[in-house]
Amino acid sequence: MANLNKRPDWIKVKAPNSTEYYNTKDLIKNLRLNTVCEEAACPNIGECWSKKHTTVMILGSVCTRACRFCNVKTGRPDLLDPYEPQRLAEAVQKLNLKHVVITSVDRDDLEDGGASHFAECISEIRKSSPNTTIEILTPDFLRKEGAAEIIANAKPDVFNHNVETVPSLYKTIRPGARYYNSLSLLHNIKKLSPEIFTKSGMMVGLGEEINEVVQVIDDLREAKVDFLTIGQYLQPTKNHAEVAKYVTPEEFKYLERLAKTKGFLMVSASPLTRSSYHADEDFQKLKENYQQKLVS
């Protein structure tokens, strides 16, 4: 039986130590911004920050949910910071980002789940960095009427919301969420603003069956999702859900090939694939694939 306490060689990454990494770290600290890279203990932080790529986390650093896979703090959330959109726009400008990814904690305590704060962040970035493309990775806005409309009207270039896992594992892995609500949110954004690219992702290695993964792939395509990401679940701490399996690179290649036959504009599936990993390069490919589809 495989030792799941020891990560296989294909999971290992180099420790961050580049000058660019520390410059990015200092700028984020000085502007008092949170990043999901740090809060969620992302394995790709060294590579991304060395390239000045970062995923900023808005709406505070404390989440109102307690998902079993996530390393972000849970509890009573922070007060909303009205100056955060301006600081975020300043960071985007100083880092000279061509593409920025904005995510957030869940804010079930807010009337719109934080949708209007996302919209304000988009607006501020557009003012100071009009050529920067904007990708947002949002919570599910469960029971937040009108949130999807606020997001769609803000016109991000990419709307990302992750289904995270298969429906049968929601009760144990993502207890505060509803699978079909997530699908509905993705579909609604596409219906409200067809020009917005939609994106969703899931983790594998939590105990799901292959037929369940295939069903999620089909469900996401039916919801008109353009871009699918699939990555290996890694246990952040001993208090989180255990890894049930380390999916091999060959198995990821199979899932990627399968998903590509379903009609997605883009699919990324590998052990270290994460929602925001290589997001800037992937956005360019996404646009190219869309243009090719139009002329084919």
Curated annotation (Swiss-Prot):
UniProt remark on cofactor binding: Binds 2 [4Fe-4S] clusters per subunit. One cluster is coordinated with 3 cysteines and an exchangeable S-adenosyl-L-methionine.
Question: So what EC number does this one have?
Answer: 2.8.1.8
GO MF terms held by the record? 4 iron, 4 sulfur cluster binding; lipoate synthase activity; metal ion binding
Compartment(s) of residence? Cytoplasm
Q: CDD domains, alphabetically? A: Radical_SAM
Q: What range(s) does the Radical SAM core domain occupy?
A: 49-265
- Main site of residence? cytoplasm
A family per Pfam: Radical_SAM
* UniProt keywords, alphabetically: 4Fe-4S, Cytoplasm, Iron, Iron-sulfur, Metal-binding, S-adenosyl-L-methionine, Transferase
- Which amino acids does the record list as binding [4Fe-4S] cluster 1? 37, 42, 48, 276
Pathway entry: Protein modification; protein lipoylation via endogenous pathway; protein N(6)-(lipoyl)lysine from octanoyl-[acyl-carrier-protein]: step 2/2
Q: Which reaction does it catalyse?
A: [[Fe-S] cluster scaffold protein carrying a second [4Fe-4S](2+) cluster] + N(6)-octanoyl-L-lysyl-[protein] + 2 oxidized [2Fe-2S]-[ferredoxin] + 2 S-adenosyl-L-methionine + 4 H(+) = [[Fe-S] cluster scaffold protein] + N(6)-[(R)-dihydrolipoyl]-L-lysyl-[protein] + 4 Fe(3+) + 2 hydrogen sulfide + 2 5'-deoxyadenosine + 2 L-methionine + 2 reduced [2Fe-2S]-[ferredoxin]
Q: Which GO terms describe its cellular component?
A: cytoplasm
Q: Which family does it belong to?
A: Belongs to the radical SAM superfamily. Lipoyl synthase family.
HAMAP family reported in the protein's UniProt record: Lipoyl_synth
Protein name as annotated = Lipoyl synthase
* Gene that encodes it: lipA
